Amino acid sequence: MPLIHINIMMAFIMSLVGLLMYRSHLMSALLCLEGMMLSLFILTALLALDSHFILASMIPIILLVFAACEAAIGLALLVMISSTYGTDYVQNLNLLRC
């Protein structure tokens, strides 16, 4: 396995550990999720280039679309929580009612 693949996997694992450690604030959780999605995007793009399979080149683009949707929903929740409660604690997510 090339060294770049190991580095990207380590970046994913570090983002996952950061998500598990700093889960009290929503902004920290969103940043860790974005780090995970970025490392997954780079890893799938590298694997698609290595495989020389035509349909494999669509997977990173689909992953990027899901990452953009996740970021938009996360930022909308962050704005809603911040304007309602004044803080970005994840425990306030249980208090939101539609």
UniProtKB/Swiss-Prot annotation:
Pfam families: Oxidored_q2. GO terms for cellular component: mitochondrial inner membrane; respiratory chain complex I. Keywords: Electron transport, Membrane, Mitochondrion, Mitochondrion inner membrane, NAD, Respiratory chain, Translocase, Transmembrane, Transmembrane helix, Transport, Ubiquinone. InterPro entries: NADH_UbQ_OxRdtase_chain4L/K, NUOK/Mnh_C1-like. It catalyses: a ubiquinone + NADH + 5 H(+)(in) = a ubiquinol + NAD(+) + 4 H(+)(out). Its EC number is 7.1.1.2. It is a multi-pass membrane protein. It comes from the Eukaryota. Disulfide bonds: none annotated. One of its GO terms (biological process) is ATP synthesis coupled electron transport. The chain crosses the membrane at residues 1-21, 29-49, 61-81. Gene3D superfamilies: 1.10.287.3510. Its main location: mitochondrion. Core subunit of respiratory chain NADH dehydrogenase (Complex I) which is composed of 45 different subunits. Core subunit of the mitochondrial membrane respiratory chain NADH dehydrogenase (Complex I) which catalyzes electron transfer from NADH through the respiratory chain, using ubiquinone as an electron acceptor. Part of the enzyme membrane arm which is embedded in the lipid bilayer and involved in proton translocation. Belongs to the complex I subunit 4L family. This is NADH-ubiquinone oxidoreductase chain 4L. The gene is MT-ND4L.
